[in-house]
Structures are given as C-alpha cells and as structure tokens.
C-alpha cells in the first residue's frame, strides 16, 4: 500500500485529518515521484537488453536448464524463460513507480512458487534469473537509483525462495 493510501486509511480509521508527519511523508513521496518515474523509464527503455543479458548470465550459471531435459531447453522453452524474466522486470517497474511493493505482490507473486513447482520449473533458477536481471538493471543506474530498483528485485527474489 502506498504511503499516500496508507496515511489516508489510517487517518480515516481514526476519523481524523492527516497529521503533520503524515503530510510530510506524503510530500517527500510526491517529491521523489520524478526520480521514481525516471528509474522506471530507464528500466523500461532497456528491458530487451536487461532480459537478454540476464538470460545469458543465467544460462552460463545454470547450463543444466538449457541442456537436453532442462526446463529452458529448446528455442520455445528458452523464450518462455526470458518472457518470465521480462514479466518480473515489469513488476519491478510497477513497484518503483508506486514506491511500494504492493503492486508486485498483488499482481504477480501470489502463488508463483506453487505454480513453478507444479510445472516442474526449478524455482531456484527463476530466482537466479531475477538476480541476474537485478545485476544488469542496477548496472544501468547510479547510487540511490540502483538501490531503489534493487530493493524491488530483492522483494521478488525473496518471494521465489
């Protein structure tokens, strides 16, 4: 839940106006909006590169998944793996824009481990792929921007472990 929504819900539950502290937090959140949008734009503009390079890193670290019998063996299954990495990158951009992990959780992580397990997909490899995407993506950002985006990648990785 975003800082704005959380503040409003809390104030309303107590039938009161927003406190000066809540208003200051909302002001800070609003002031960081341009930065969060810039980060999301960089990730969006570089999504093909991020996914491609993350896939290359994953397949180097885990050659078993692209070998015969592996979950990403063959052109179609490799494309499916890369599609999933793209999906998680997209979720990260949602979190960055929202300034909160709620959209990541609500849109894309509920039941994901169970789904991968039921399909026989090695969840550890998916987490490793997201780690690789984080490495590539944060390499395109500097300092605080990399830390901001990195925290949402970490959220996805933790959900997969």
From Swiss-Prot:
Main location per UniProt?
A: plastid
InterPro entries referenced in this protein's UniProt entry, alphabetically: Globin-like_sf, Phycobilisome_asu/bsu, Phycobilisome_asu/bsu_sf
| Keyword terms, alphabetized | Antenna complex, Bile pigment, Chromophore, Cyanelle, Electron transport, Membrane, Methylation, Photosynthesis, Phycobilisome, Plastid, Thylakoid, Transport
Q: Which residues bind (2R,3E)-phycocyanobilin?
A: 81
Give the modified residues of type N4-methylasparagine. 71
Q: One Pfam family from the UniProt entry?
A: Phycobilisome
This protein's GO cellular component annotations are: cyanelle thylakoid membrane; phycobilisome
Share an example GO biological-process annotation for this protein.
Answer: photosynthesis
Task: Name its cellular compartments.
Answer: Plastid, Cyanelle thylakoid membrane
Q: Which family does it belong to?
A: Belongs to the phycobiliprotein family.
Record note on quaternary structure: Heterodimer of an alpha and a beta chain.
Function field: Light-harvesting photosynthetic bile pigment-protein from the phycobiliprotein complex. Allophycocyanin has a maximum absorption at approximately 650 nanometers.
- Kindly provide the name given to this protein in its UniProt entry: Allophycocyanin alpha chain
What organism does the record attribute this protein to? Cyanophora paradoxa
Q: What is the lineage of its organism?
A: Eukaryota, Glaucocystophyceae, Cyanophoraceae, Cyanophora
